[in-house]
Amino acid sequence: MCGIIGYIGNEKASKILLKGLKRLEYRGYDSCGIATIDDTIKLKKNTGKVLEVSKKENFEDMTGFIGIGHSRWATHGGITKNNAHPHYDCSEKICIAHNGIISNYKELKELLISKGHIFKSETDTEVIPHLIEEEIKDFKEITEKTYINAIQNTIKKLNGTYALLILNQDFPEMLVGVRNESPLILGIKKDECFIGSDISAFLEYTKLAMPLNDRDIVILRKENDEIDIEVLNYGKQVQRDTIELQWDMESAEKEGYEHFMLKEIMEEPVILKNSMKISKLEIENLGKEIEKCDKIYITAMGTSLHAAMVAEYWFSGLNKLVIPIDSSEFLTKGIVDEKTLVIAITQSGETYDTMKAVKYAKEKGAKTATIVNVLGSTATREADITIMMGSGLEIAVCATKTFMSQLVILYRLFIEYGKIIGKNMDIFEKELLNIPNYISKVLDEKENISKIAEELTAKNYLFISKGINLANALEGALKFKEITYLHAEGMSSGFLKHGTISLIDENMDTVALIPPSKSELLNSVLSNVEEIKARNGKIIGISPVEDNLKYSIKVPDVIEEVSPFVYATACQLLAYYKAVDLKRDVDKPRGLAKSVTVE
């Protein structure tokens, strides 16, 4: 992985591909490359940032109206020029860009080497062009039909996940894409087509998109001034629906902010209003399913899992057991049958482990639903019920506004279920409408939070709370370590004295999420804070009450059920400003990807 873009049309391909790779930078990468076809295939690639590599390799000098580009995040082989994508076959007539992981590449590589193929990289990807080359040898004549057959025969040999873009010098007016458990979507115009791992790569050119299904092979042919699109699945021609994208390019611009992350945090009050309005019927339907089903799981990864953990507390207040579960553990822990409901939360709709959990649940006969931000993604096509988040495009790798949208959707679901079972949910409905104002008050604290962040010098941090905001302690720690590169650990404040308190000294700072004034947990958390102070630990309080702390971030004193919203924004700002203070790459932290599409 991590990002791919293809172009076929009447414009200079290298220019389009370069811009597309820039748009895909937020997905994370360590090297990049471009291949174009103009009689022969020209390939240039190297390690480093897109603009650095472009300048070094002269991307803009590459000619041709058809091409593919790739930004790589190393999974097999080191960060080297040879390991960067795209990759050739032996003849340098076939060129491939690939997202995903080929799990049986070692056996395939050994077989190909035994047949005389020479490899130049350590990657799993490089076996693919060589396999196609080998398959073509079996045909007496190279025609379009035999070429496509060679691709079909090749993918039958591949185990794993892949989104492929393929150029062939013998077919200079053609671009082929293949999808299997790794996202690939077409952007369509009459005289040109774009194909990429997500819509941000081509959103500025067209809003008409065609998501591809697993095992699809899409053949794009340039015929005079138009592009012919053919989709095959298991050798048979199929039709795929197109969708009209709702996002616009303004979402992909910083609009005066230093970083996308800060822009996206500042957008939260407006975004949450959007999330309060959408998917009303779907939320009603999902509420009914929750009432009917015996077992309810919310499966997710990373930040989305923390949203699921908040929901667990909301539903427990209605005496309904809802179990949050790490998607990568779902197949070993989830007890699933026909009376089970599995709700998958995934911002991208492509998270590999979460999609694997959904497919497993469907195989067991469970009802499935998804809370997702990308229309036309795999999640929307796999799940029985789709609830859109309404967050708009999120560019920064760290999830901020999408986390808040997930919370709003889950909170609305909690309200809906409560009404279905006859509970009075008036206070919760009233407070839902107040959440954007509460978030705005937290955003007003940003200068204070920035000053506090500058004074923090520790290398290790604890984030603690209790009850419903335990999830926010975990989320706060995750955000902090993601972008500051400092060690941070979230836990229940009650867990401290069971081992972790031995770490407390002047070199370990603690961020305490202090409960609202009417919470039964307030005195308990304050007592834990005193225990830390007694051991010379520095406390940063995120608090709606008077806490007598040197470092204190004030948040509105709200009902406990709504408190996760205000603590989340405060934690996001603290992580952001500390990362800025440390001069980190805030929007693209090292080693991370926006959409994790491999196991």
Curated annotation (Swiss-Prot):
Q: Where is the Glutamine amidotransferase type-2 domain?
A: 2-223
Q: Which residues form the signal peptide?
A: none
Q: Which domain of life is it from?
A: Archaea
Q: Which residues form the SIS domain?
A: 286-423, 452-589
Which EC class, in a word?
transferase
Which GO CC annotations does the UniProt entry carry? Answer: cytoplasm
Keyword annotations from UniProtKB, A to Z: Aminotransferase, Cytoplasm, Glutamine amidotransferase, Repeat, Transferase
Active-site annotation: C2, K594
For the biological process aspect of GO, one term held by this record is: protein N-linked glycosylation
Localization annotation: Cytoplasm
Query: In the UniProt record, does the keyword Repeat occur?
Result: yes
Known EC number:
2.6.1.16
This enzyme catalyses: D-fructose 6-phosphate + L-glutamine = D-glucosamine 6-phosphate + L-glutamate
A single GO molecular function, which one? carbohydrate derivative binding
Question: How activity varies with pH?
Answer: Active from pH 6.5 to 7.8.
What this protein is reported to do is described as: Catalyzes the first step in hexosamine metabolism, converting fructose-6P into glucosamine-6P using glutamine as a nitrogen source.
Instruction: Show the HAMAP family listed in the entry.
Output: GlmS (MF_00164)
Subunit note: Homodimer.
Please give the name of this protein: Glutamine--fructose-6-phosphate aminotransferase [isomerizing]
Show the taxonomic lineage.
Answer: Archaea, Methanobacteriati, Methanobacteriota, Methanomada group, Methanococci
